[in-house]
Amino acid sequence: MKELVVLSSESHTLDGCDRVMLSGDQVIVQGKPGNRADLPGVRVPDDEVLSTVSVRVFLEAARALEQRLGQQ
């Protein structure tokens, strides 16, 4: 297994994810079970704590979030 690189650590809200870690070409998302993620591409299933998404999907979600925050 490749070394995990922590990209983000955010625990201030109940929505979204707590930890985002990069492992090769996959992003591992640690979230709060049962809560809705801010973006569907990084949603963690209700009965799981860890989920993976491709780097491409994660970057698309991050860019969409940046655009949304820039419009506020």
State where each predicted segment sits.
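Compositionally biased amphipathic helical and low-complexity segments enriched in hydrophobic
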Residues: V5-S8, S23, G70
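A short, structured beta-strand/loop element
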Residues: T13-T52
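Mixed-charge, Lys/Arg-enriched low-complexity segments
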Residues: V42-Q72
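Short, charged/polar N-terminal "headpieces" of proteins
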Residues: M1-C17
